[in-house]
């Protein structure tokens, strides 16, 4: 069964609904990627490079989940989002519930060295 092609604007609209970090920590280099930029990055990864759909995706420094949730929306087989900031991961979880993508992403609040396994695609 062929999966439907997601329009870039549809992806951008979804990503714009993700709640940003309320108080980013400069020492952790936290910033919110604009929805338009994130959609472009993910769209290229998904459709130009075939690196998202049916792939295992790791999002290092996932923050509030913008790239992780976008990858899940673009039909990644499995998505793991990792961030050392527990409050960011809590917000990523809330975002995934609100966008009905909770079952598509595993969230880990820890340093990246705890991640085990292999992944087809790494986002950061």
Per-region residue spans from a language model:
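Class I S-adenosyl-L-methionine-dependent methyltransferase catalytic core
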Residues: 1-124
């Amino acid at each position: 069964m062929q999966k439907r092609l997601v329009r870039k604007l549809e992806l951008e609209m979804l990503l714009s609904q993700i709640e940003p970090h309320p108080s980013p920590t400069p020492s952790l280099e936290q910033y919110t990627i604009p929805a338009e930029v994130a959609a472009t990055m993910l769209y290229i990864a998904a459709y130009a490079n075939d690196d998202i759909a049916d792939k295992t995706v790791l999002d290092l420094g996932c923050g509030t989940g913008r790239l992780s949730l976008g990858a899940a929306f673009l039909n990644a087989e499995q998505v793991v989002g990792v961030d050392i900031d527990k409050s960011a991961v809590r917000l990523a979880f809330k975002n995934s519930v609100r966008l009905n993508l909770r079952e598509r992403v595993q969230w880990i609040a820890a340093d990246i060295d705890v991640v085990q396994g292999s992944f087809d695609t790494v986002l950061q």
